[in-house]
C-alpha cells in the first residue's frame, strides 16, 4: 500500500530512508522552502528531524545561519527511539544518546546568541521506563523547548510491541491490533475512542507530574536551559553536559 502511494511498487523501502539528491544544507533548506510554499502558502511550519549523531550540531548550526529563517523546529531523535519499520540491528546499534547531542546543539546556539531562534525538540526513549515527566524535565533543563513521544503513544493505542518482544509488523500492513494497516479485516480491531482516551489521560498525568517537578525550582513556565537545576553523580556526565557533579 505504501509502495503504491509513493509510486515505487515492488521496491523495498528502508527506514529510516535516505534522501537521494540532498547533499548539502542549502539543498535541504531549498526543499523546506518548496514544502512551505506547497503547504498552504507558508501558513504551516516545516521542521527538520535528525537522528542524534556526530553531525547533528553541524546541521543545526547551518540551519541557525539560514538567512530566510524558515525552519520551524529541530527534532533530535536518540538511539533509544524506535520505529516498527526499522531493522532490529539499526534500532539497537545506530545513533547517539539524545542527551549529549541536545546539549551540544543548545550550547552552540547560546554561543551565537541564537538560542530559541529554532526550537529544539528531544525524543528517543522518553518515558520508556515509566518516567516520562522526569525525562522531559531533564531534557528541557538541558536546552530542549519540548519533547516528543512516539512508541509509548502507540502502545497506549494497543500496540503489542515492546522492548522485550518487538512485533515489527508496522511496515507489513498486517498489524495485529489494527493500528498500522489499511486492511479492513484488521482495522476494526482498533478501538479509536478508547485509545484516544488513554492518550489524553496519560498526557494529563504527565502534565501534572511535570508541574510538580518544576515547583521546587520556582518555575511556572518551562525551565529551558536551566542546567543548574540538574546534578549527577557521574563526573564524565557532568563534564560532558556542563552540569553540577555531586558525590
Predicted regions and their residues:
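ATP-dependent carboxylate/acyl-activation modules
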Residues: 1-13
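Compositionally biased, intrinsically disordered low-complexity regions
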Residues: 9, 180-184, 197, 244
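Glycine-rich phosphate/ribose-binding loops and adjacent secondary-structure elements
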Residues: 16-187
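Glycine-centered secondary-structure boundary/capping sites
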Residues: 7, 95-96, 113, 143, ...
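Short, exposed beta-strand "edge-strand" segments with a Pro/Gly-rich flavor and a Y/T-containing core
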Residues: 4, 16-23, 214-220
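C-terminal extensions of enzymes
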Residues: 188-247
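Residue-level detector of functional hotspots within protein domains
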Residues: 11-14, 106, 133, 203, ...
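Short glycine/proline- and acidic residue-enriched helix-loop micro-motifs
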Residues: 11-18, 189-193
Amino acid at each position: 500500500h505504501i509502495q503504491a502511494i509513493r509510486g515505487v511498487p515492488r521496491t523495498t523501502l528502508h527506514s529510516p530512508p535516505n534522501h537521494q539528491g540532498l547533499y548539502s544544507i542549502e539543498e535541504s533548506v531549498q526543499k523546506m522552502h518548496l514544502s512551505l510554499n506547497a503547504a498552504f502558502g507558508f501558513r504551516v511550519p516545516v521542521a527538520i528531524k535528525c537522528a542524534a549523531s556526530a553531525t547533528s550540531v553541524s546541521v543545526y548550526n547551518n540551519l541557525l545561519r539560514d538567512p530566510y529563517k524558515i525552519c520551524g523546529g529541530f527534532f533530535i531523535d536518540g538511539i533509544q527511539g524506535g520505529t516498527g519499520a526499522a531493522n532490529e540491528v539499526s534500532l539497537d546499534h545506530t545513533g547517539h544518546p539524545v542527551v549529549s547531542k541536545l546539549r551540544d546543539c543548545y550550547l552552540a546556539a547560546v554561543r551565537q546568541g541564537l538560542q530559541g531562534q529554532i526550537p529544539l525538540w528531544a525524543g528517543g526513549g522518553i518515558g520508556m521506563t515509566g518516567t516520562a515527566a522526569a525525562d522531559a524535565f531533564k531534557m528541557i533543563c538541558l536546552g530542549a523547548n519540548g519533547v516528543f513521544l512516539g512508541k509509548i503513544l502507540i502502545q497506549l493505542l494497543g500496540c503489542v510491541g515492546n522492548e522485550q518482544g518487538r512485533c515489527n509488523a508496522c511496515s507489513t500492513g498486517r498489524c495485529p491490533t489494527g493500528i498500522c494497516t489499511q486492511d479492513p479485516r484488521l482495522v476494526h480491531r482498533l478501538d479509536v475512542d478508547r485509545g484516544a482516551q488513554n492518550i489524553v489521560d496519560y498526557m494529563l498525568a504527565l502534565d501534572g507530574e511535570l508541574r510538580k517537578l518544576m515547583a521546587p525550582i520556582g518555575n511556572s513556565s518551562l525551565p529551558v536551559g536551566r542546567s543548574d537545576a540538574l546534578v549527577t553523580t557521574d563526573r564524565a556526565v557532568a563534564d560532558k553536559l556542563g552540569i553540577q557533579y555531586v558525590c
